[in-house]
């Protein structure tokens, strides 16, 4: 079975997820034109190679009108790391999460006064209109919208407002839309049969947002991570952003330790901040010996039926179940 595994020992962010997925391809630069053909208005995907604590990997940058937005947290912790372009892009910087550190809490980390002309916010209906016109298959579009539905629901709970009244800030920007669309496209293109992830390292301390300084995880991120194993640790800062949390929540089927698998490719997505440990998101693509099996459990209350009639009903049920998943239990 083809397995995709996310190692979230340094959290997860939208651009890091995209970069790590691109790293799984033998020639990531050849995939870049496909991302730029998605058709997000005024958006250009660019790719940089670099190192973090000696680990080589990729960094995804999204340019809006030829410019890249940076958030307050990134600006505060930024450090040059000798990146070299893999396409028509300038050399850049590395350090930690997300060029835009796209924190869902619709305030996300933008520095007051740092809002460029392309720093626009959208509500859910605006985003749906943008996604509708993208050059993606219907199934990929459905996943993009599902990720945003999760973000909207988390924001709604955090701010005690109906989803219809939620106006996204950072995660409503075009660069965040680009991260989500690219991640969904690449996961579909890689076509794993199962997706797993480690427990997510969320960081600790506080994070700068448009609404002020909030504890990690920020409220919306916390809601997105409900039901998912997480841990804090001693690293100060937000390691798991809302966009990263929403993407993983939507796609990951099981959170736990790395299972026995034969790896075919390993990818590293570099973050923007510098920490004492390698700030990377690692993905592993390979094969595991586990068999895919579905179990259909039908429960019914029989008042007056002969054994022959019950057997006939079971036979009819099996006809509509494909051979690889023909495991039926009736109680």
What are these regions (language model features)?
Residues 23-24, 28-158, 218, 227-230, ...:
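Glycine-rich nucleotide/cofactor/substrate-binding loop typically near the N-terminus or early
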Residues 1-4:
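Extreme N-terminal starter segment of soluble prokaryotic enzymes
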Residues 319-331:
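Single conserved hydrophobic/aromatic residue that forms the stacking wall/gate
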Residues 192-294:
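Mobile "lid/hinge" segments at catalytic clefts and subdomain interfaces of large enzymes
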Residues 306-318, 322:
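Short amphipathic alpha-helix segments
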Residues 11, 60, 175, 248, ...:
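Divalent metal-coordination and catalytic microenvironments
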Residues 6-18, 168-187:
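Conserved phosphate/anionic-ligand binding catalytic regions in large, soluble enzymes, centered on
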Residues 292-304:
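Short glycine-/aliphatic-rich beta-strand segments at the starts of folded cytosolic domains
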